[in-house]
């Protein structure tokens, strides 16, 4: 079988949901708001394809730096490099 290099490769177990969590997320996850400077966790919701960050950022925590359209811009520290990630609110969870 040919080797494919899609954006969701190697995510068979990483993006898998629990049985009762399957299906579309609640509307409250779509309309959640964040403050600039707030810490958020990146938890990719595999049932929503729009605004999905890259799989390497799944499980990381970033700081909100602004909004771009319906998505939020975050800064992430990847080793010594500071990276900007753009993700929709369905894939973000506020840090408690």
Swiss-Prot record:
Keywords: Ribonucleoprotein, Ribosomal protein. GO terms for molecular function: structural constituent of ribosome. Pfam families: Ribosomal_L21e. Signal peptide: none annotated. GO terms for biological process: translation. One of its GO terms (cellular component) is ribosome. PANTHER family: 60S RIBOSOMAL PROTEIN L21 (PTHR20981). Belongs to the eukaryotic ribosomal protein eL21 family. This is Large ribosomal subunit protein eL21. It comes from Methanoregula boonei (strain DSM 21154 / JCM 14090 / 6A8). The gene is rpl21e.
